[in-house]
């Protein structure tokens, strides 16, 4: 089964000056494509590690000497910065071949995983804005935080796996 619903978006995006400019820039240089992919992988690693550390702490598996809320508050800016770099570097990859990406099931699944993971990260941050111990104050919040931590690990892992499969699907 192939998801073709998004193919018209890829066709439209490919006809835009932005996409044409991205293709021209990538063709004009020998270093831009590998530099973009390298930055994409480094940002992905940064994002995943920061999300994994927070998730593993919320699960109580690491960092028992660090308050979960304080740790998350320190790492979330790194997570958001890495996500911004991922959007820019991934955007260049997509703009170069939008038709291919928007016809790819793996790309659509990846974007779904990313959107859900970002939504959870926002929810985590909203809770932390109410206090560093927000997720530890009640048993229900602890269960939500732990479930969300597993959810985040699954979502970010799914995004990474689908991202790698885009090249081969």
Q: What kind of region is each of these model predictions?
A:
Residues 1-169:
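Polytopic transmembrane helical bundles with strong interfacial aromatic enrichment
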């Amino acid at each position: 089964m192939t998801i073709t619903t998004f193919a018209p978006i890829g066709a439209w995006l490919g006809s835009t000056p932005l996409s044409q400019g991205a293709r021209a820039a990538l063709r004009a240089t020998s270093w831009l494509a590998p530099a973009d992919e390298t930055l994409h992988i480094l940002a992905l690693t940064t994002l995943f590690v920061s999300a994994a550390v927070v998730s593993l702490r919320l699960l109580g598996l690491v960092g028992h000497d660090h308050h979960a809320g304080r740790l998350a508050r320190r790492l979330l800016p790194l997570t958001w910065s890495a996500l911004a770099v991922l959007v820019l570097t991934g955007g260049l990859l997509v703009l170069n071949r939008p038709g291919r990406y928007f016809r790819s099931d793996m790309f659509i699944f990846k974007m779904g995983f990313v959107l859900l993971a970002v939504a959870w990260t926002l929810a985590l941050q909203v809770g932390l804005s109410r206090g560093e111990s927000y997720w530890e104050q009640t048993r229900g919040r602890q269960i939500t935080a732990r479930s969300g931590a597993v959810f985040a690990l699954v979502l970010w892992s799914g995004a990474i796996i689908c991202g790698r499969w885009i090249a081969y699907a």
